[in-house]
Amino acid sequence: MEEKSVQPSYRNPRVRRWASYLWREAIVKSWGPIAPAFAKPNPAKWSNAQITAAWLGHSTVLINFFGINILTDPVLFPRIGIRIPFLFTIGPKRLTAPALTVDELPRIDIVLLSHAHFDHIDWRTLRHLSRRGGAKADFCPSVKVVTAPHTRDLLRWTTLRDVTELPWGKRKSFHTAAGDIDIVAVRVKHWGARMQHDNHRGYNGYLIERNGRRILFAGDTAFTDTFAQLRECGPIDLATFSIGAYNPWIASHASPEQAVQMANDAGARFIMPVHHQTFRLSFEPFREPIERFEAALQNQPERIALREIGETFVLPD
């Protein structure tokens, strides 16, 4: 049975009050400084014989999957929201800087986009990614983009042209300069509209497979029992789950405890918590998501891949 979209309705007065409060908070916070990332990854030193992943902030994860470089939901500028061309962006400002800038990224082979929300598809980052070093830099035709159904049009403002929309349950093999990789679109419980009235857009998680290893990038999701079905694909070595923005958006964002449960349902060996400590998108305190996540795994702390923005995880043999 398909998960139904859980898009909040602005006809609901509670939703309007929450949105207004968070908007005011975003404006107030915009006057404050942006804290530095906890650590700075060094992808140049990563081995192509291993699986290495670094959390760059929010849902942006840089993965070296046996030599194939994958970037999830790249958002690497100080602010998200509606961009006024050549001027500024209207929307929430980062609380913590990204661990790497666009120009500090290594060669990217594949970009995974989970859904169309402004904190997951960021035009400014994608434009810079497709023209590394600025508008006069050479076009990067080798970057492959995998995205949810009915979101391809959002990339027309970039020079990224190798775009695949992947519906739930669909598997596709991709060839890169470093070899081949399989990606499966995973059903999640969320919503895909970028604005209020384009709710036809899809929303995905992704299972990535190469050399007998599997990584799950769950994107944004509320609690759902569908991840248990992934056990049929084989063991999952690393699962990346969002753990923030659950208060009051629990209908579309899992709590830390629910994220752990879904990772357990999927049979994940290690869990990487993301989507926290970056933007003010909800009411929970800044450190609450990671503290609750650690508490949920207090008997298995060795399964926590990382905790802070900029940390790097190397998958053990």
Can you say where each PLM-predicted feature lies in the sequence?
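Cap/insert and terminal regions of metallo-dependent hydrolase folds
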Residues: 2-10, 143-146, 150-153, 223-309
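Di-metal (Zn2+ and/or Mg2+/Mn2+) metal-binding site signature of metallo-dependent hydrolases
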Residues: 97-133, 149, 154
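Divalent metal-coordination and catalytic microenvironments
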Residues: 63, 73, 115, 122, ...
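Active-site metal-binding loops of divalent metal-dependent hydrolases
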Residues: 74-76, 116, 186-190, 220-221, ...
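Short amphipathic alpha-helix with an adjacent loop that forms part of the alpha/beta core around
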Residues: 99-106, 172-178, 197, 228-233, ...
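Short, conserved loop/helix-junction motifs that constitute active-site signature segments
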Residues: 104-106, 127-141, 232-235, 262-267
